[in-house]
Amino acid sequence: MASGVAVSDGVIKVFNDMKVRKSSTPEEVKKRKKAVLFCLSEDKKNIILEEGKEILVGDVGQTVDDPYTTFVKMLPDKDCRYALYDATYETKESKKEDLVFIFWAPENAPLKSKMIYASSKDAIKKKLTGIKHELQANCYEEVKDRCTLAEKLGGSAVISLEGKPL
């Protein structure tokens, strides 16, 4: 079921900026987004970038010690969100980076919010082409342990996430 909610151009631009890893100056790399949250506009007609809810690559190691833990803390406990997380992980063979689409629908969110977000998920996923990994979570227990994300990225082959061993 489609909800009629549109995806704003800003969301698509952020996604394309995160997806394309072109050679950049160190200053440009620091400004790349590591994680972002998307929410519904106040009139519930558009999916937009949530202001102030992002982690920049340049923040990691400076103001952000563990980007994954910081990201989990950004998720609201009483409302739904969509998120993009640029995961850096290691398998037994190599180091990898992949974008993960996350649908956050906590149990404490209002039913109407859960319904709108659930029915709009396909609209945003169609615009974010090339996403290999998706995670849906309904409580902090499901996301606070980095093993849940590692499982989505490659299961037992993943040995570390964000430089932290599993």
From Swiss-Prot:
It is found in: Nucleus matrix; Cytoplasm, Cytoskeleton; Cell projection, Ruffle membrane; Cell projection, Lamellipodium membrane. The modification N6-acetyllysine is found at K13, K73, K144. InterPro entries: ADF-H (IPR002108), ADF-H/Gelsolin-like_dom_sf (IPR029006), ADF/Cofilin (IPR017904). One of its GO terms (molecular function) is protein phosphatase binding. It comes from the Eukaryota. The keyword Ribonucleoprotein does not apply. The modification Phosphothreonine is found at T25, T63. Inactivated by phosphorylation on Ser-3. Phosphorylated on Ser-3 in resting cells. Dephosphorylated by PDXP/chronophin; this restores its activity in promoting actin filament depolymerization. The phosphorylation of Ser-24 may prevent recognition of the nuclear localization signal. Phosphorylated via a ARRB1-RAC1-LIMK1-PAK1 cascade upon active ligand stimulation of atypical chemokine receptor ACKR2. There is a cross-link at K132 (Glycyl lysine isopeptide (Lys-Gly) (interchain with G-Cter in SUMO2)). A motif (Nuclear localization signal) lies at residues 30-34. Pfam families: Cofilin_ADF. The keyword Protease does not apply. Residues 4-153 form the ADF-H domain. Widely distributed in various tissues. Not found in skeletal muscle. The modification Phosphotyrosine is found at Y68, Y82, Y140. It is a peripheral membrane protein. The modification Phosphoserine is found at S3, S8, S41, S156. One of its GO terms (biological process) is cellular response to epidermal growth factor stimulus. The modification N-acetylalanine is found at A2. GO terms for cellular component: cell-cell junction; cofilin-actin rod; cortical actin cytoskeleton; cytoplasm; cytosol; dendritic spine; extracellular region; filopodium. Binds to F-actin and exhibits pH-sensitive F-actin depolymerizing activity. In conjunction with the subcortical maternal complex (SCMC), plays an essential role for zygotes to progress beyond the first embryonic cell divisions via regulation of actin dynamics. Required for the centralization of the mitotic spindle and symmetric division of zygotes. Plays a role in the regulation of cell morphology and cytoskeletal organization in epithelial cells. Belongs to the actin-binding proteins ADF family. Can bind G- and F-actin in a 1:1 ratio of cofilin to actin. It is a major component of intranuclear and cytoplasmic actin rods. Interacts with the subcortical maternal complex (SCMC) via interaction with TLE6 and NLRP5. Interacts with C9orf72. PANTHER family: COFILIN-RELATED. This is Cofilin-1. The lineage of its organism: Eukaryota, Metazoa, Chordata, Craniata, Vertebrata. The gene is Cfl1.
